[in-house]
């Protein structure tokens, strides 16, 4: 049976109409529409929770998607840095806690890149080189684990979209993060990317769809930035239909059903 595609929407007062909640959901909506999916708009997870079946897909944010996965006893997880791809990191990465960093000047002044070890935690990753960079990272009530890495001097970044062991597209995103970057002047090394993919397909528990973010450093190295799961992911200009297929591949793998959009 074909499942439904649930689309998170919001009411736009200016236009007096329901619109997709963000542009990623809009892109996926157009992609699923092209493949003749039945699309059902909704506002809150509570509105669809009881009706939601394994065959269905929801276009929503990470935490909301997880509520639906949990209904079926599924907890999605992809490591940021899979073991088989560690040779491509080009930097040391280790675990620490946010409080231990804020207490130690040697740590908070070192210019390390710090991000929560658990995705849904308080802040997005950033470079910490002074005590004020820690503002907004702490949470006095709880000390939590962070991943710390040596800083990279990044010139350009790309998101490689992988569906069923193939790179579907590679989209630049560095300038979204930092307008001063001239990422278009750089290119990654295609041979390194091919080697990354050879390692990727040797990874036993690999996802059927995900993104592999890569970068080129100012000294010309092509390196792995991190992996991201595909069930709720920034599209960065990926063509609508490929974006929808990527989402479907991962949802069907996670919920153990046939991927109806794998054609």
Residue ranges and their predicted role:
Residues 164-170, 205-237:
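Conserved metal-phosphate-binding beta-hairpin within the catalytic cores
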Residues 95, 260-263:
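A short, terminal or domain-edge coil/loop segment
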Residues 3-34, 42-200:
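Active-site nucleotide/adenylate-binding loops and adjacent lid/helix of ATP-dependent enzymes
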Residues 1-2, 263:
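Basic/polar N-terminal segments that are highly enriched at the extreme N-terminus
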Residues 237-243:
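Helical (often loop-to-helix) elements that flank the catalytic cores of nucleotide-handling enzymes
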Residues 174-222, 245-261:
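A long amphipathic alpha-helix within ATP-dependent nucleotide-binding catalytic cores
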């Amino acid at each position: 049976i074909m499942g439904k595609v649930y689309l998170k929407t919001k009411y736009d007062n200016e236009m007096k109409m329901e619109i997709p909640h963000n542009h990623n959901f809009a892109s996926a909506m157009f992609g699923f529409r092209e493949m003749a999916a039945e699309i059902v708009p909704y506002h809150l997870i509570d509105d669809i929770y009881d009706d939601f079946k394994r065959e269905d897909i929801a276009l929503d944010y990470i935490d909301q998607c997880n509520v639906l996965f949990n209904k079926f006893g599924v907890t999605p997880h992809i490591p940021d840095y899979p073991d088989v791809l560690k040779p491509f990191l080009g930097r040391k990465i280790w675990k620490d806690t946010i409080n231990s960093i804020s207490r130690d000047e040697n740590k908070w002044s070192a210019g390390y890149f710090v991000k929560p070890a658990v995705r849904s935690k308080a802040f997005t990753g950033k470079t910490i080189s002074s005590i004020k960079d820690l503002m907004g990272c702490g949470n006095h009530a709880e000390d939590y684990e962070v991943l710390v890495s040596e800083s990279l001097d990044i010139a350009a970044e790309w998101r490689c979209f992988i569906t069923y062991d193939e790179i579907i597209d590679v989209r630049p995103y560095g300038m979204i993060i930092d307008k001063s970057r001239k990422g278009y002047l750089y290119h990654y090394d295609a041979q390194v990317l091919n080697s990354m993919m050879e390692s990727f397909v040797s990874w036993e528990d690999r996802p059927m769809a995900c993104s592999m973010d890569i970068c080129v450093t100012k000294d010309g190295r092509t390196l792995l930035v991190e992996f991201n799961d595909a069930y709720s992911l920034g599209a960065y200009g990926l063509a609508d239909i490929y974006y929808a297929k990527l989402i479907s591949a991962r949802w069907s793998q996670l919920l153990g059903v046939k991927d109806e959009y794998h054609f």
